[in-house]
Curated annotation (Swiss-Prot):
Biased segments, Polar residues type: 1-28, 119-136, 306-315, 553-570
Catalytic activity: O-phospho-L-seryl-[protein] + H2O = L-seryl-[protein] + phosphate; O-phospho-L-threonyl-[protein] + H2O = L-threonyl-[protein] + phosphate
Record's keyword terms, sorted: Cytoplasm, Hydrolase, Magnesium, Manganese, Metal-binding, Nucleus, Protein phosphatase
Name the record gives this protein: Protein phosphatase 2C homolog 1
Gene: ptc1
The species this protein was found in: Aspergillus flavus (strain ATCC 200026 / FGSC A1120 / IAM 13836 / NRRL 3357 / JCM 12722 / SRRC 167)
Amino acid sequence: MFSGSSSPPKDKSNSVPHSGAVDTQSLSVHPEEGSAAQTSKSLPSGGFFTRRTSEDQAPAGEKKRRSSTVTKAATFFTNAKNSLSLSSSPRESSSFNYTVRSPQTLQSLGSMDPALSVPQGSLNNSAGDSLPTPRSSFKVGVTEDRNRKCRRTMEDTHAYLYNFLGTPAPLARADGENEAGSSLAPDEASSVVETDNGYFAIFDGHAGTFAAEWCGKKLHLILEDIMKKNPNTPVPELLDQTFTTVDQQLEKLPVKNSGCTAVIALLRWEDRIPSSHSATGSSALAPAAAAAAAAKGDSNSEADDTPTQATSSGPSILPKLQEKAIRQRVLYTANVGDARIILCRNGKALRLSYDHKGSDENEGKRIANAGGLILNNRVNGVLAVTRALGDAYLKDLVTGHPYTTETVVQPDSDEFIILACDGLWDVCTDQEAVDLVRNVPDAQEASKILVDYALARFSTDNLSCMVIRLDTNRVKEVINKTAEPIGVAGDPSMDVEHGVSEADKIIEGARKSMANADIADDGETAEKGKNDILHKMVDGEPGPEMSLDDSNDAPTVSHLNKTNANNGIP
């Protein structure tokens, strides 16, 4: 997304920001006028022998001043070279280009963590191989392009799952004891529980690929684990907690400079009840039941100091709530940075994300209040986004708290979803993207059309685009109960013996592959080996992100069927 010490510049004519360029002529010493030897003509500057002759003919005071100037200039040049990783090879001596480093990958860590050893699935899916089933109500298409004319490396990753974790039953206990697809550890007899709950994500890396690759392999697993432990917590809060956890784990790794923007979406089946307190007009049954049980328990405790009444109030409330509940399709989103998610509703583009850029007034105020500053629309003059995962060296300013939304899908009007990095949005508006692919029923073809359009419009960044085409007829059948319900604990299709989530099944396959290769993934030896590998990776770590792009477009947010949770945005 952004050019940095590990990425090539977007334009050869602007290979390095002006603030980082060093004029080689500043290292030449120009003797002051008044010297007896220079009253008739000036000697050419820049040569070694010229400087030596000038020093021999100049007074001692001038020699000392010039020596001090040369020392300071040399020190400045050395520091600039180290911070920007300037190349000093003869082939590149004519211009200051960033040194080409091998992209950081997680291959060396795969032997220590099954999640990091999962092979790429179809369409280069970082989460592994995930395919639709006859009961799937959506189809995913993904196209990515390095943009080789402008980029030497591909720093984007993406992930998706067709059968993400099932929606928990109301008042389910923590750790997923009552949750479909998560009650048992995967084993040889385990099978994937078909949930029709989708997970989609795009990670746009900068200053190397490490953070983006790590998130592509791990974020959905962290999210699933948090959802299992908090089955009655609203999903937007769980998304915020997941991003915070990911940020904390990345900060502990030695690769401090790598970071990524992120946009993720969850498409879930939920039993929901009407709610006047929700912007969507309804709320999920599980959190509502938990809140009602807690409220009734508190009132009973005040009337009678009997603690058992609080715990027994839940089952008595649940039947009343279930009578009002209806099955609905819900889309949850979360993003940090400038990757976007767009929902097409009746042909209109609805943006369900927020561009966290230095040009945004709200984000600029937040950065200033945190002790930073915005220079040339960049955080401290370095990073073009104000929120990201990773970037530990700027973590006091660049937070990982996401912007979250909650949208109830309207099957009669909601057609498809677009997730893409800024490589597309820099040259294409939200509505243009919708208009380009609205009449393209195939999701894969639609994603390719958008990437090709961005290349034709001279996008200078890596390109990743994901299109999720909704099967409106299938959604209507489930909502109208003309088809068997799916996705929520308690449904007949969820009652699978030794059933596990799709993510758990993929990890189990990777663990078996490691076992067949006689590679241990636990114990002190594995942990020590993991730390040794990580510390070795630090030696080749790219420098901080240096963005050459200057985007002045102000973000616009579509306020439709959305709720904000822990966004920190006024």
